[in-house]
């Protein structure tokens, strides 16, 4: 059952009773269906496993006696005796009866010659079509197999297919109908020719009943082929037409199709497709170019079918052209085209299956943009199509679309109109309601089989069951309400008791239907409800119906009218009276008339009693309720009794809602328009101030009178919905009511709004409808009153911009890097450790709003300084990983790829990543002395910044798509400082600052998208390693120059000293040197021994030495040597 609208949009207690009465009692049956009778559906069942219902057709024979048939194909039905096969398939004919198992098998295709053919799995009944009332019937077996040289070495088997054409009484008359049709027999064999043509996959008749059309999608390597032949023996055109051979391919967009296109999988024809009153043929090729195509063809004088237009599908593997139908949906004289694509899917919008409606523009198809109808996921929506004829007799054809895997299966009914197809289905038939699964796999309509002048619908399935849905006649009811008196004067009681005021209400009904001969007795039940709007506000009604029925409420009166035939006008009347002491004398009394068709109780009917007549139904497109208002006589309008009010909208501006009683005006743009930021605000306020003051204080009587029934009407855009009303003072707030979808608001400002009154209030508007495409909020405001005043609408606008709540930050680890070692060329690099110090950058993007995939394509970009200005390496990128930007537990792929030199990754890092361990700080490597030997003073050193923004470095941009993330995404970048570049270029630099920049960019079609704080700068300081400043490896020529320079300096110094006389020796007079001889002194006679004995040590006084002459030398103990005697012993010496 279709969903019924909820009744809680106002949230007041008095709503539910009336709406539940109206909807449940009157509108509920009409909301669930229109004029196809579901309760009286006729089921037919076949043999289990026979695929009874794979194809269906409505048929009506006129001779020898009129009878309607439900033709059902069962391509897996068991074989007949003599067919020498297990399953051959068959065609079944079912009468219109309540019996479910009274179908019989049409007597065709008996016997078999196994030397020439095989009927095993020939799938007879795969397609079945009828010409209509009194016409022929065609059914096919597309897997029929022709054999030659059976049981021989050169035996051949060709799956050519075949069809049978039956007379209107389902008998085969070869002399009239041709009987068995095998177009591919006797033609060249092989799958590249006609050996697998599968004639009869689709078969149909032209609408003028002259031509029979067969589809053979297996011909020419499954390119496909169409055969068209005339079955009208009186027609002089008895040629057989077929589509072009592969060798006859035409040029241009309307050329022939490629192989494996399956041309002829679906076929139809119609007049007015290309030229008025000219017959064209249409064929589907669901595998053409992997998207599918539909070809419109014409026949020429050379028995060929020439393609004129090719319509291509929009999605790969959508099966565009799997089914098709031709009809004039808008009745403009030009045939329109409906194409099914059951394999179409849209993952984001959760759509599955599609039907494309091409509205013919006078035979021009090039610039037509088709309307696309879609089903639910995996429903196979569009696998079957049927033209129903004018189902509701409104002058426009209707169509049916099958979706066999939408639940138990559904069939969607779409009405035609002057503008084309109505996109909202008028009725949805569900397989669950009739107990059939895979309901809607095949469809047939457009023929009235029960004789009520309304076309019916036959629905097949894959569950060996079919069901007939008969159309119910549609009644168009006219109703009128007469009120007396039209205005209520509370000062003039007119009831019989003379105390109260009474109002007479008269209602009249009549109906018309199609055809004019259809005139059943129609019984209508109606209900008059008094003071409807007041009760919707939760207030007690002011009226009662004295003559109400026993089951009626006091404010309601019900009745029944019986219309005997079309145009019969029958009336009913009643009286309501106003209650005593009515206080609300300003608001009008609303009387609502609701009516419905009285449906007789369904009685169970025996199967042999024939079909019961289907009951009529009211037109679902015609409202079954009517309102009328009864006003009070107005008072207080001055001496002239003419109310000339002066309602003015003094203030109208958008405000942000801070609390329930606090509002703040939105900021203004340069042009004075309010600015609204879409950043999670669920509501927005609209401040309104309405005054009723005299326009000229000097002439206060000229205007400014009471404004009776003063109202403010607000029309909201689709992005805003009414939520409530607030006031800041203690005065009574206006009563505001909205329509069902809260897009139109009516606020009562007073009845009357007194002279000198000023009302300020806030409309609370929900912003849930604001989307990313919304650029402006525009509310149309109109003051209304029944007093004399000329009022014009006023517009309030606000610009909408979307501020992305994104923040980005970054950090480098470590934040200081050092360089040292030896200079290595790029070709010498083998591992990442050869490059230099490792650094890791971590960039975090936080998202506090909705997922980015709803706004556009977002990218996280990092500007990586990979080279200095002269092209030498700076930071070598090793690895880039994005976490969180692709969804939970997914890693994104950034471009371009890092590590373009394909250096080996440090095995320790690879092991940690495989184990998922955190990355530790890299241990310091063994410091190698720098190869630089020339010392640089600290005063000469300088600070350098390497930044791509300043032109001191060259950057490569790594771009990482952020498809969706809820809270945060983290980008990890690992790199290596190129040690050699710094040794060669920056030895004289005190420090270097390497700048890495990151930002977020959004590619979106949204013009009002604002992105702030979307960039960050990550610096890293680089220094020369102080431990490594040691000179080594001095070149030999430097050593040679240093030696030579030293020798030269030494020579100059010696020459200078020689010139100054430094090398001249001083001359002294010749002196007598005393001679000493060694003597032996006994130990006990030595002075030292004596001193040691006595304990007194006397040291020599080296300062009082004795000199002999002026040139004498002091006598030192160190100069003394003992003189040896003849025996070798020291001798004593006397001075």
UniProtKB/Swiss-Prot annotation:
| Residues noted as binding Ca(2+) 1 in the record, renumbered to the chain | 328, 330, 332, 336
State the sequence repeat positions. 1111-1114, 1119-1122, 1127-1130
Q: What is the effect of changing residue 603 to G?
A: Abolishes cleavage by urokinase
What Gene3D superfamilies does the database record attribute to this sequence? Bicelle-embedded integrin alpha(iib) transmembrane segment, Integrin alpha, N-terminal, Integrin domains. Chain A, domain 2, ntegrin, alpha v. Chain A, domain 3, ntegrin, alpha v. Chain A, domain 4
The record describes its membrane topology as: Single-pass type I membrane protein
- Regions crossing the membrane: 1037-1057
Recorded hits in Pfam families, A to Z, give: FG-GAP, Integrin_A_Ig_1, Integrin_A_Ig_2, Integrin_A_Ig_3
Q: How is it modified after translation?
A: ADP-ribosylated on at least two sites of the extracellular domain in skeletal myotubes. A 70 kDa form is created by proteolytic cleavage. Cleavage is elevated during myogenic differentiation and the cleaved form enhances cell adhesion and spreading on laminin.
> Where is the motif named GFFKR motif mapped on this chain?
1061-1065
Q: Which GO terms describe its molecular function?
A: cell adhesion molecule binding; integrin binding; laminin binding; metal ion binding; protein-containing complex binding
**What residue spans carry the region label 3 X 4 AA repeats of D-X-H-P?**
1111-1130
Return the annotated region ranges for Disordered: 905-933
Its family?
Belongs to the integrin alpha chain family.
The protein's name in its UniProt record: Integrin alpha-7
Q: Organism source for this protein?
A: Rattus norvegicus (Rat)
């Amino acid at each position: 059952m279709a969903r019924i609208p909820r009744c809680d949009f106002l949230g007041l207690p008095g709503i539910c009773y009336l709406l539940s009465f109206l909807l449940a009692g009157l509108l509920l049956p009409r909301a669930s269906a229109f004029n196809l009778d579901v309760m009286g559906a006729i089921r037919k069942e076949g043999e289990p496993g026979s695929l009874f219902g794979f194809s269906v057709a409505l048929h009506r024979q006129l001779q020898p006696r009129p009878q309607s048939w439900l033709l059902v194909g069962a391509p897996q039905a068991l074989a007949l005796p003599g067919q020498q096969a297990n399953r051959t398939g068959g065609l079944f004919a079912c009468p219109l009866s309540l019996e479910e198992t009274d179908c019989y098998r049409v007597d065709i295709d008996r016997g078999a010659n196994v030397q020439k053919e095989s009927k095993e799995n020939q799938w007879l009944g795969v397609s079945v079509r009828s010409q209509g009332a009194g016409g022929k019937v065609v059914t096919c077996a597309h897997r029929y197999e022709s054999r030659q040289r059976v049981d021989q070495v050169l035996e051949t088997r060709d799956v050519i297919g075949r069809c049978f054409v039956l007379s209107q009484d389902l008998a085969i008359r070869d002399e009239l109908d041709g009987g068995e049709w095998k177009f591919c027999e006797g033609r060249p064999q092989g799958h590249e020719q006609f050996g697998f043509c599968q004639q009869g996959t689709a078969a149909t008749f032209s609408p003028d009943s002259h031509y029979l059309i067969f589809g053979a999608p297996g011909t020419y390597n499954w390119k496909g082929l169409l055969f068209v032949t005339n079955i009208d023996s009186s027609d002089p055109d008895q040629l057989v037409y077929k589509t072009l051979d592969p060798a006859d391919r035409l040029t241009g967009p309307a050329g022939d199709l490629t192989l494996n296109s399956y041309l002829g999988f679906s076929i139809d024809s119609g007049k007015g497709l290309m030229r008025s009153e000219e017959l064209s043929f249409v064929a589907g090729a669901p595998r053409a170019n992997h998207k599918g195509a539909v070809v419109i063809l014409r026949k020429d004088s050379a028995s060929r079918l020439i393609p004129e237009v090719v319509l291509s599908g929009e999605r790969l593997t959508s099966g565009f052209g799997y089914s098709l139908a031709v009809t004039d949906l808008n009745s403009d004289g030009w045939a329109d085209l409906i194409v099914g694509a059951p394999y179409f899917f849209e993952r984001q919008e959760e759509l599955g299956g599609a039907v494309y409606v091409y509205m013919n523009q006078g035979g021009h198809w090039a610039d037509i943009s088709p309307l696309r109808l879609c089903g639910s996921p995996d429903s196979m929506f569009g696998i079957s199509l049927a033209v129903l004829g004018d189902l509701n007799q409104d002058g426009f054809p209707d169509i049916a679309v099958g979706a066999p895997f939408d639940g138990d299966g559904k069939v969607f009914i779409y009405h035609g109109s002057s503008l084309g197809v109505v996109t909202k289905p008028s009725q949805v038939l569900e397989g669950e309601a009739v107990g059939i699964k895979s309901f809607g796999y095949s469809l047939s309509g457009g023929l009235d089989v029960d004789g009520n002048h309304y076309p019916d619908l036959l629905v097949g399935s894959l569950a060996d069951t079919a069901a007939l849905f008969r159309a119910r006649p549609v009644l168009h009811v006219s109703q009128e309400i007469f009120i007396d008196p039209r205005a209520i004067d509370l000062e003039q009681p007119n009831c019989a008791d003379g105390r109260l005021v009474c109002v007479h209400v008269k209602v009249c009904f009549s109906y018309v239907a199609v055809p004019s001969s259809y005139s059943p007795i129609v019984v209508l039940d109606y209900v008059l409800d008094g003071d409807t709007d007041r009760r919707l506000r939760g207030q007690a009604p002011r009226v009662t119906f004295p003559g109400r029925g026993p089951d009626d409420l006091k404010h309601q009166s019900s009745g029944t009218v019986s219309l005997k035939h079309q145009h019969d006008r029958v009336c009913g009347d009643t009286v309501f009276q106003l209650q005593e002491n009515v206080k609300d004398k300003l608001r009008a009394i609303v009387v609502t008339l609701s009516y419905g068709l009285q449906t007789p109780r369904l009685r169970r009917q025996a199967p042999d009693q024939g079909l019961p007549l289907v009951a009529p139904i009211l037109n679902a497109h015609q409202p079954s309720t009517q309102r009328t208002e009864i006003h009070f006589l107005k008072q207080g309008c001055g001496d002239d009794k003419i109310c000339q009010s002066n309602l003015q909208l003094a203030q109208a501006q958008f405000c942000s809602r801070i609390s329930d009683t606090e509002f703040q005006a939105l900021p203004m743009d340069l042009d004075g328009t309010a600015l609204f930021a879409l950043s999670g605000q669920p509501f927005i306020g609209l401040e309104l101030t309405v005054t009723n003051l005299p326009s000229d204080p000097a002439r206060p009587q000229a205007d400014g009178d009471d404004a009776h029934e003063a109202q403010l009407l607000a029309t909201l855009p689709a992005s805003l919905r009414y939520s409530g009303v607030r006031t800041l003072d203690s005065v009574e707030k206006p009563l505001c009511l909205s329509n069902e979808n809260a897009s139109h608001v009516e606020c009562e400002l007073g009845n009357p709004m007194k002279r000198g009154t000023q009302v300020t209030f806030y409309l609370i508007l929900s912003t849930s409808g604001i989307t990313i495409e919304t650029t402006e909020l525009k509310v149309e405001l109109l003051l209304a009153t029944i007093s004399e005043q000329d009022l014009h609408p006023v517009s309030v606008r606000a610009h909408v911009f979307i501020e992305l709540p994104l923040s980005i930050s970054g950090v480098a680890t470590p934040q200081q890097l050092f360089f040292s070692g030896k200079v290595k060329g790029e070709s010498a690099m083998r591992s990442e450790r050869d490059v230099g110090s490792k650094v890791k950058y971590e960039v975090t993007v936080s998202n506090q709003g909705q997922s980015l995939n709803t706004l556009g394509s977002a990218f996280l970009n990092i500007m990586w300084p990979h080279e200095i200005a002269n092209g030498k390496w700076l930071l070598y990128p090793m690895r880039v990983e994005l976490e969180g930007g692709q969804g939970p537990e997914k890693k994104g792929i950034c471009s371009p790829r890092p590590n373009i030199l394909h250096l080996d990754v440090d095995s320790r890092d690879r092991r940690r990543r495989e184990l998922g361990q955190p990355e530790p700080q890299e241990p310091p490597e063994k410091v190698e002395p720098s190869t630089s030997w020339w010392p640089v003073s600290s005063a000469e050193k300088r600070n350098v910044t390497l930044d791509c923004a300043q032109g001191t470095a060259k950057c490569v941009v790594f771009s990482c798509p952020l498809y969706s993330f809820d809270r945060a995404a983290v980008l990890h970048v690992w790199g290596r400082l190129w040690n050699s570049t710094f040794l060669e270029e920056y030895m004289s630099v005190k420090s270097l600052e390497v700048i890495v920049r990151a930002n977020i960019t959004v590619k979106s079609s949204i013009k009002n998208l604002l992105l702030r704080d979307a960039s960050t700068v990550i610096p890293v300081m680089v220094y020369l390693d102080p431990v490594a400043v040691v000179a080594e490896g001095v070149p030999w020529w430097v050593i040679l120059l240093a030696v030579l320079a030293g020798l030269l300096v030494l020579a100059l110094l010696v020459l200078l000293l020689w010139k100054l006389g430094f090398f001249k020796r001083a001359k002294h007079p010749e002196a007598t040197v005393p001679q000493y001889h060694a003597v032996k002194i006994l130990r006990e006679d030595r002075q030292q021994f004596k001193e040691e004995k006595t304990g007194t040590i006397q040291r020599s006084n080296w300062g009082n030495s004795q000199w002999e002459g002026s040139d004498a030398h002091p006598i030192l103990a160190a100069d003394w040597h003992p003189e040896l005697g003849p025996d070798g012993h020291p001798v004593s010496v006397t001075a």
